[in-house]
A protein has these predicted regions:
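Conserved Rossmann-fold NAD(P)-dependent oxidoreductase catalytic core, especially the SDR/UDP-sugar
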Residues: 4, 11-57, 82, 95
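Active-site Tyr-X1-5-Lys
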Residues: 15, 54-87, 103-121
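Alpha-helical substrate-binding/gating segment
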Residues: 75, 89, 105-174, 182-200
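Active-site pre-Tyr helix/loop in NAD(P)-dependent dehydrogenases
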Residues: 30-31, 45, 67, 86-93, ...
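Short-chain dehydrogenase/reductase
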Residues: 3-7, 46, 51, 55-67, ...
Length: 200
């Protein structure tokens, strides 16, 4: 369903833009369209040269189709449908949940919580945990038992849950090899850049 929903959304937007006389459109893609093992720093011409990251493949395929659809409309109908591929975005209203956030908000929250633990600021930790409780995975449940982890839990249970995600007293553990290059872009800067692209 995921690939179908993404394809339908962008096909509807792009085709209806053309049928309603829209001459200029900005299509937001994603850097996941590039191959999993693309050389770093990444260049645009590596698109479709080797396999995609399997965990993002459906989304990437839909985004590639949208990019190619814009290209085809431009060639066939003379439209100015622009596809841009923003890098890793972060900003206001981001997802900071430890289970499923992207890399930047995950790092920010981990560092923030490690600092609070170091300072012994349990009031702020409880506020944070109530705002974004942890719904334990099977592995975490084996360590802390059943039930969500929120600010109403005892300190020991909260600390065990946070340690599971690599959050300690004034220290965080980040997963991965540290070799991949990443670029981050503030979402409001991306919004400004999008307006600039559309107006120029």
């Amino acid at each position: 369903d995921f690939i179908m929903q993404n394809m339908k959304m962008q096909c509807n937007v792009i085709s209806n833009a053309y049928s309603h006389g829209v001459k200029k459109l900005l299509f937001l893609g994603s850097t996941c369209i590039y191959p999993k093992d693309a050389p770093q720093p990444m260049k645009e011409d590596v698109l479709l040269t080797s396999p995609l990251e399997y965990t993002n493949e459906e989304y990437a395929i839909a985004k590639i189709a949208g990019l190619k659809m814009c290209e085809s409309y431009n060639l066939q109908y003379g439209t100015n449908y622009i596809a841009v591929m923003p890098t890793n975005l972060y900003g206001p209203n981001d997802n900071f949940h430890l289970e499923n956030s992207h890399v930047m908000p995950a790092m920010m929250r981990k560092i923030y919580l490690a600092k609070l633990i170091h300072e012994g600021d349990w009031k702020s930790i409880e506020v944070d945990m109530n705002k974004r409780p942890i719904n334990p995975t099977d592995k975490l449940r084996a360590i802390i038992g059943e039930g969500n982890v929120d600010g109403n839990n005892d300190h020991e249970r909260i600390l065990k849950a946070l340690e599971f995600y690599g959050i300690y007293n004034n220290k965080v553990v980040l997963w991965g090899t540290g070799k991949p290059l990443r670029e981050f872009l503030w979402s409001e800067d991306m919004a400004d850049a999008s307006v600039h692209v559309l107006l120029n």
